[in-house]
UniProtKB/Swiss-Prot annotation:
It catalyses: (S)-4-amino-5-oxopentanoate = 5-aminolevulinate. It comes from Shewanella oneidensis (strain ATCC 700550 / JCM 31522 / CIP 106686 / LMG 19005 / NCIMB 14063 / MR-1). One of its GO terms (molecular function) is transaminase activity. Its EC number is 5.4.3.8. InterPro entries: 4pyrrol_synth_GluAld_NH2Trfase, Aminotrans_3, Aminotrans_3_PPA_site, PyrdxlP-dep_Trfase, PyrdxlP-dep_Trfase_major, PyrdxlP-dep_Trfase_small. SUPFAM superfamilies: PLP-dependent transferases. Belongs to the class-III pyridoxal-phosphate-dependent aminotransferase family. HemL subfamily. Homodimer. This is Glutamate-1-semialdehyde 2,1-aminomutase.
């Protein structure tokens, strides 16, 4: 038994499922999860001391790589001044100014402690500002675990929301409408059915929780137009894509202006953090300037602000995003080339520092229903093969992969050579 396996057995005695977030349990791929002891650059190291080239990056925040010296130094310096004050700090102001400077649609921003808090608060604000109850989300998009957001569509059909987790009253879920991602007709149909009841659309501009699905041309622009036509707010959830797809997020990359934006992951440099911001007239509706209540004991935590500011400063380096995109393209297209070489059907998507691969004969994956038809057994086999080769991918066929600036030529080469060997073994076995 490895030390990771032993720790997992020990953890299950005191922690539900042995983990503090479900995907970490490896239920999507089978086997026992790795327990991580440390990380540096492009590598993570498990409890047995084995190194892995990491394409999870703490689920997105580690865009510069693990344990980056500038971030580490900023955190250590901040710790000497205290861990939390429960009062305003100059660091919060600096972070707000940095976010506003990088994302033109954000005129004011409120810091929180997680992505779930950010999306939950943005939706409450949208409901309060519009005085409407219903929200519109998309099948397969994840926006955190707030009650109103854990809702799915039935068989891809347009539907009044049904809870997708016990513990969510149907009275909550009925206000959540679910449309089909990358299908404007499904959105217009809901607006025509509820023309004065929908407060907002919330969307992942690149869906990263059904693997990696970019928007088709015109989709985000169409959502903007529909919101304008029916008086709803457009919330772009950039918790995952913010400052990962481009310096101004996915909204900058695709040229779409939302009313509100949610952020997380990258802006914390690896620390727990979230934020929501947007039009000043909307943001002024939040307490203490407005009637919509939102608060948080650790919001704007000085350690998180210090880490985030250090990372955000580094992201302004000229040519960084072009280099990151080139690395991502090489990995995604390298996986596809290896799969083609061995006659294993695969489709790929990638944008900025995010990528996804799908074991399927479908050529272009643009919707959630296509993702659910992919070969999960092939994914599991590939996943464990890569893990044995020292490459750590997201342990779920429904999660995106992430590159960092720490992934160099050697890491990319080793990863693609490993993929070639694993796919060759898969072909031989079949």
């Amino acid at each position: 038994m490895t030390r990771s396996e032993a720790l997992f057995e020990q953890a299950k005695k005191t922690i539900p499922g042995g983990v503090n977030s479900p995907v970490r349990a490896f239920n999507g791929v089978g086997g026992s999860p790795l327990f991580i002891e440390k990380a540096d650059g492009a590598y993570i190291y498990d409890a047995d001391g084995k190194a892995y080239i990491d394409y999870v990056g703490s689920w997105g925040p580690m865009i510069l790589g693990h344990n980056h010296p500038k971030i580490r130094e900023a955190v250590l310096a901040a710790v000497h001044n205290g861990l939390s004050f429960g009062a305003p700090t100059e660091l919060e102001v600096q972070m707000a100014e940095k976010v506003i400077a990088m994302v033109p649609s954000i005129e004011q921003v409120r810091m929180v402690s997680s992505g779930t808090e950010a999306t939950m608060s943005a939706i409450r604000l949208a409901r309060g500002f519009t005085n409407r109850d219903k929200i519109l989300k998309f099948e397969g998009c994840y926006h955190g675990h707030a009650d109103c957001l854990l809702v799915k569509a039935g068989s891809g059909a347009l539907t009044l929301g049904q809870p997708s987790s016990p513990g969510i009253p149907e009275d909550f879920a009925k206000h959540t409408l679910t449309a089909v991602y990358n299908d404007l007709d499904s959105v217009r149909s809901l607006f025509e059915q509820y023309p004065t009841e929908i407060s907002c659309i919330i969307i992942e501009p690149v869906a990263g929780n059904m693997n990696c699905i970019p928007p088709i041309p015109g989709f985000l622009e169409g959502l903007r137009s529909l919101c304008d036509e029916f008086g709803a707010l457009l919330i772009i959830d950039e918790v995952m894509t913010g400052f990962r797809v481009s310096k101004s997020g996915a909204q900058g990359h695709y040229g779409v202006t939302p009313d509100l934006t949610t952020l997380g992951k990258v802006i914390g440099g690896g620390m727990p953090v979230g934020a929501f911001g947007g039009r000043k007239d909307v943001m002024q509706f939040i307490a203490p300037t407005g009637p919509v209540y939102q608060a948080g004991t650790l919001s704007g935590n000085p350690i998180a602000m210090s880490a985030g500011l250090a990372q955000m400063e580094a992201l302004c380096e000229e040519g960084l995003y072009e280099a990151l995109s080139a690395k991502t393209k090489r990995i995604a297209e390298g996986f596809k080339a290896a799969a083609d070489k061995h006659g294993i059907p695969m489709a790929i998507n990638y944008v900025g520092g995010m990528f996804g691969f799908f074991f399927t004969e479908q050529e272009h994956i643009t919707r959630f229903d296509q993702v659910t038809k992919c070969n999960i057994e092939h994914f599991r086999t590939f996943y464990h093969g890569m893990l044995d080769e020292g490459v750590y991918l997201a342990p779920s066929a429904y999660e995106a992969g992430f590159l960092s600036m720490a992934h160099g030529e050697e890491e990319l080469r080793l990863t693609l050579e490993a993929a070639d060997r694993v796919l060759a073994r898969m072909k031989a076995a079949n």
